[in-house]
């Protein structure tokens, strides 16, 4: 056999091997609620809402959401066989914003740090955009994820919100922590002018360990809505209640979400949580 023929045969074997690996990977690609999960990309899923979560969401006269929807963004290299932290995004109720809408704001900084981003919603609108409505749909979204990836129940979870969403993030985090259904590893609260997290700790009593959860307050130096003074008061309130890891960071800007602050906060959560 000539050297040329031998090279062709070896090269051909390498090509066949590469093709086989590609086909093998394609056959084992992760899916969620019928959607293919591509690392570094985002998907939108639909999922059934169980009676349990419908009962929660429909309080205060809201309709019963039978189907939920969620936007998820995944970091490069994502593989559900490994553990990944999840950033749960909660939006304000102003301007008819939904958490699924706000998820895109956090996508770039969060996925760059190796986090999954989750924003949940329904396929119908509520009569009142209540905390119970948000809780029911978030719970149903987590249930849908855990149905296909049971191991995700043990993944660390942080809550993030801007303005009104930051207040509600604290409430939802305390409620879910009280139920023992999530492993809370941090709160990123931006543009916040009232301490709902501390109040929720006292109301829902998730346990003393909750006071060890790191809290990052992100304040715009020229914010006319959630002023620097308001952020200082929120920090003081949290520390007075007993939160031990409260960090207030200020940036040049107004009432806005600063992407670089999101990234720094997620790095801090990882450092303290050692995950």
Show where each model-derived region lies.
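Cell-envelope and extracellular/periplasmic
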Residues: 90-94, 146, 162, 169, ...
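Catalytic active-site module of serine/aspartate enzymes centered on a nucleophile-bearing elbow/loop
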Residues: 262-275
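Bacterial N-terminal signal peptides
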Residues: 12-23
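Primarily recognizes the serine-hydrolase "nucleophile elbow" in alpha/beta-hydrolase
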Residues: 155-209
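A domain-start/cap signature at the N-terminus of enzymes
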Residues: 27-84, 176, 233-236, 246, ...
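Gly/Ser-rich "nucleophile elbow"/oxyanion-hole loop immediately N-terminal to the catalytic nucleophile
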Residues: 76-83, 129-164, 177-178
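Active-site machinery of serine-nucleophile hydrolases
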Residues: 86, 92-140
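The feature captures the conserved acid-bearing segment of alpha/beta-hydrolase catalytic domains
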Residues: 186, 191-262
